[in-house]
UniProtKB/Swiss-Prot annotation:
Extent of Low complexity compositional bias: 35-52, 266-283, 418-490
Record keywords, A-Z: Cell membrane, Membrane, Transmembrane, Transmembrane helix
Annotated stretches, region: Disordered: 1-324, 362-491
Source organism of this protein record: Staphylococcus haemolyticus (strain JCSC1435)
UniProt-recorded name of the protein: Probable elastin-binding protein EbpS
Segments of skewed composition (Polar residues): 70-81
Subcellular location: Cell membrane
Length: 539
């Protein structure tokens, strides 16, 4: 089979991959960065690019760059350790360039690996060994197979073997040109490279352990912060967990030197075997280191799983302990809490009842105040009405008194007028008596003087009797007039008064009948009256 039968148009048209600059950047990061082991482990799962002359040339160039990298460590191992370095560098750079190409092809491979791991688990005796073998087999299969089918893998492996044999022949030619001292240096260089690989593995292991310890410490700190109340109870469990972790770490550290010693022995044997077997031993060493790394990863994963399981149990234990403490505390709490709840309920009820009673009292007081206010208002109204009535009565009485006073004045005036008229009548009577006496004296002049004197005396007596009779009559007339006037009133006209107004004032109504009474009493023929005129007001 020809080497180029395998090519197609896609591979022929591919551009060359010159990754020297990228490799130099990666070597600088490899020396400076503390996480180079994780990067190498992640990139070791990737696949190789297609097999062609460009790839082989790149491998040779990378081998020389790798030798320059390790020149500071050991000058004797630069030329003779190129095979191991070349193999490691190929796996490092080729996996780095094909990371994106094989991302979509990993899912079916993982499914096949899962089936193969389950099959190996049923056939092996120990669960841990079977799990390690399944993981190692998975990574070997990812490393060897890629996304090609079985025929392509067979052809690729065949071409890879041809390339490796050709490289070995070239390397043998170079080795034959050198002296035996160069061969011894190659053996020492191979041993040094193996030791460096072992040291690197130990360093990676220490870093992983430190990373795991930091994770564990962070988890423990968080757990201590969340469980401050159960610090005394958790301290014992944390101590046991730390002891178990330390024992597991010690056991793992005991297993690692053995594996490292095996790797060193294999490297020394590879150096002694010569240039022809160096490639095979290097491949075996790489696979073995790959398995050891997988074993370490699986062991750390199992250890993390155990820690998580223990933490889960510990948290369950804490929950149970808290529940147990809750049951212990529930004795007093079960007694006190209901009592406190009852007291609070009773206090609330008492407060509401007091507020209700106070509101009722306030309402009743307000109602009483309202009734008192209304009663006071009614009393005030009654008193005002009484006062107004009293004032009206007083006014009426004062008016009556005034009317009586005016009537008395009128009666007194009438009495004076009557007395005047009686005096006039008495004067008339006296004059008439004088005339009679004169006539009598003239008639009786012819009589004697004695008779004349007797007659004069008799006349005087008669006159006195007459005057007495007249006075008695006048007095009787005055008494009659006073008695008659006592039932009547007088009114002096003033201003613009008329009979209608006077009738309204004394009778309450200005009717025609009342006006006629006034006319008849006063002898008036018309309604005309003058100011200052006195009118008699009949009853």
């Amino acid at each position: 089979m020809s080497k180029n039968n395998f090519r197609d148009d896609f591979e022929k048209n591919r551009q060359s991959i010159n990754s020297d600059d990228q490799f130099e950047d990666n070597t600088n990061e490899f020396d400076e960065n503390s996480n180079e082991s994780n990067d190498f482990d992640n990139q070791s799962d990737q696949q190789f690019p297609p097999r062609n002359a460009q790839r082989r040339q790149r491998r040779r160039n990378q081998a020389t760059n790798k030798n320059r990298k390790f020149g500071n460590q050991n000058s004797d191992s630069n030329a003779n350790g190129s095979l191991d370095d070349r193999h490691d560098e190929d796996s490092f750079n080729e996996l780095q360039h094909n990371q994106q190409e094989n991302h979509l092809d990993n899912e079916p491979i993982h499914k096949d690996d899962k089936l193969s791991s389950e099959k190996d688990f049923n056939n092996d005796a120990s669960r841990r060994n079977n799990r390690h073998e399944a993981s190692n087999r998975k990574h070997d299969k990812d490393y060897d197979n890629g996304s090609l089918n079985d025929d392509d893998r067979h052809r690729r492996n065949h071409e890879e073997g041809i390339d490796e044999r050709q490289d070995n022949r070239n390397h043998k030619d170079q080795q034959n040109k050198k002296s035996r001292h160069g061969k011894d240096a190659a053996i020492a260089g191979g041993a040094g490279v193996a030791g460096a690989a072992g040291a690197k593995a130990a360093k990676d292991k220490r870093k992983k352990d430190e990373h795991h310890d930091s994770k564990y410490n962070e988890h423990k700190d968080d757990r201590d912060l969340n469980n401050d109340n159960q610090f005394d109870q958790n301290r014992k469990h944390d101590k046991d967990l730390h002891d178990d972790h330390r024992d597991a770490k010690d056991n793992h550290s005991k297993e690692e030197p053995k594996k490292g010693n095996k790797g060193k022995k294999a490297a020394v044997g590879a150096g002694a075997a010569g240039a022809a077997g160096a490639a095979g031993v290097a491949a075996a060493k790489h696979k073995k280191d790959h398995k050891n790394n997988n074993h370490k990863d699986n062991h750390s994963h199992n250890r993390d799983h155990q820690d998580d399981h223990r933490n889960h149990k510990h948290e369950d234990g804490n929950d149970g302990f808290q529940a147990h403490n809750g049951k212990k505390k529930r004795g007093l709490a079960g007694i006190l809490l209901p009592l406190i709840a009852l007291l609070l309920i009773l206090a609330a009820l008492a407060i509401f009842i007091g507020m209700y009673l106070n509101n009722d009292k306030k309402d009743s007081n307000q109602a009483d105040n309202k009734t008192e206010q209304t009663a006071n208002k009614d009393n005030n109204k009654d008193s005002k009405d009484k006062a107004s009535n009293d004032s009206d009565k007083d006014k009426a009485s004062s008016d009556k008194d005034k009317d009586k006073a005016t009537n008395d004045d009128d009666s007194n005036d009438k009495a004076t007028t009557d007395n005047d008229s009686s005096n006039n009548s008495s004067d008339d009577n006296s004059s008439s008596s004088d005339n009679s006496t004169s006539s009598n004296s003239s008639d009786n002049s012819s009589s004697s003087d004695n008779n004349g004197n007797n007659s004069n005396s008799d006349n005087n007596n008669g006159n006195s009797q007459a005057t007495s009779n007249n006075s008695s009559q006048s007095n009787s007339n005055n008494n009659q007039s006073n008695s008659s006037n006592s039932g009547q009133q007088t009114h002096v006209v003033s201003g613009n008064e008329n009979l209608y107004r006077i009738a309204i004032q004394y009778y309450g109504e200005g009717t025609v009948e009342n006006v006629n009474k006034l006319k008849q009493a006063n002898g008036l023929s018309s309604n005309n009256i003058s100011n200052g005129q006195k009118l008699i007001i009949p009853q």
